[in-house]
Amino acid sequence: MTSLLFLVLISVCWAEPHPDNSSLEHERIIHIQEENGPRLLVVAEQAKIFSQRGGNVTLPCKFYHEHTSTAGSGTHKIRVKWTKLTSDYLKEVDVFVAMGHHRKSYGKYQGRVFLRESSENDASLIITNIMLEDYGRYKCEVIEGLEDDTAVVALNLEGVVFPYSPRLGRYNLNFHEAQQACLDQDSIIASFDQLYEAWRSGLDWCNAGWLSDGSVQYPITKPREPCGGKNTVPGVRNYGFWDKERSRYDVFCFTSNFNGRFYYLIHPTKLTYDEAVQACLKDGAQIAKVGQIFAAWKLLGYDRCDAGWLADGSVRYPISRPRKRCSPNEAAVRFVGFPDKKHKLYGVYCFRAYN
């Protein structure tokens, strides 16, 4: 019997970008794994990196060929692309791309991100002047010829999670309003991971709030009726995913270090809200935001037993050393409420940013 040998040829079209073409993001890559030769490997030496707002950080990423110490074959240009994964993992946001001498950064990362390039196989990304929104997971992708591989690095920020509801009261925010409410208070909407870490650190809160992935949850360390249910285990209770337009809950916000001074303004008299705003301005500052009082309390140990106005019209005071008449049972940012702004009953907390 005559044996027939069929040879199937697969043709791959490859177009090198024109040297003057800076639109690197539009280049179409066809990914095919070569059967022969060393395989391209991309490695992140650390899966998690910790930093804080205003700092600089390096997200590690290196690439190798399996069973060799070489960085590349030398026959193809190497393309490095960094993207940020959204909290629901449904999208990737472009951060930075490099190929040859071409470099391009995107959106709010422009002017703040660079490749470290400490060696020929170093694709690590440097992020400067870290913002709250930089928190999250980043993907490093390296492409050489027909090969590609990826690694994921998580950027975590030191900070504090706090529950927030507006003057209108409990359960009055849809998802988009919740996002804006956090931004207005010098913070961002918290992720599940951030809320989980806050719960592990003792956060106990009985009102459900939005998280960045669109879920609604709340942390319970001391289960009770009607907070998590009597005779149940502690944990982060999950209400699931709700309509982002019509469903209304509170929100959990996250903030980190600030570049400035938070302080209680010494003033001869108590102030109305409008007088409080003007008093801070006269002192070369602005009335402080809720995120700033939580950051000062949690990260700097700020302690003051005087209730003061904040920018959202609420009145609060931070206690890091519990004592008689000053939050005797626990360290906390105490919430007085949203009093009538014409009441001349409180002081004010101010914030002066450093240039």
Curated annotation (Swiss-Prot):
Q: Where are the transmembrane segments?
A: none
Question: What positions does the domain Link occupy?
Answer: 160-255, 260-352
Q: Which ranges are cleaved off as propeptide? A: 1-9
Keywords per UniProt: Disulfide bond, Extracellular matrix, Glycoprotein, Hyaluronic acid, Immunoglobulin domain, Repeat, Secreted
Listed as disulfide-bonded, the cysteine pairs are C61-C140, C182-C253, C206-C227, C280-C350, C305-C326
**Gene Ontology MF term list:** hyaluronic acid binding
Cross-referenced Pfam families, in alphabetical order? V-set, Xlink
**Which GO CC terms are listed, alphabetically?**
extracellular space; perineuronal net; synapse
Glycosylated at which positions? N21, N56
Domain Ig-like V-type: from-to ranges: 38-156
Query: Does the keyword section mention ATP-binding?
Result: no
Q: Which domain of life is it from?
A: Eukaryota
Entry keyword annotation includes Repeat: yes
Tell me the compartments it is located in.
Secreted, Extracellular space, Extracellular matrix
GO BP, one example? central nervous system development
What CDD domains does its record include? Ig_LP_like, Link_domain_HAPLN_module_1, Link_domain_HAPLN_module_2
Q: Which InterPro entries match?
A: C-type_lectin-like/link_sf (IPR016186), CTDL_fold (IPR016187), Hyaluronan_bind_Proteoglycan (IPR050691), Ig-like_dom (IPR007110), Ig-like_dom_sf (IPR036179), Ig-like_fold (IPR013783), Ig_sub (IPR003599), Ig_V-set (IPR013106)
Biological role stated in the UniProt entry: Stabilizes the aggregates of proteoglycan monomers with hyaluronic acid in the extracellular cartilage matrix.
Q: Which family does it belong to?
A: Belongs to the HAPLN family.
What's the protein here called?
A: Hyaluronan and proteoglycan link protein 1
- What is the gene called? HAPLN1
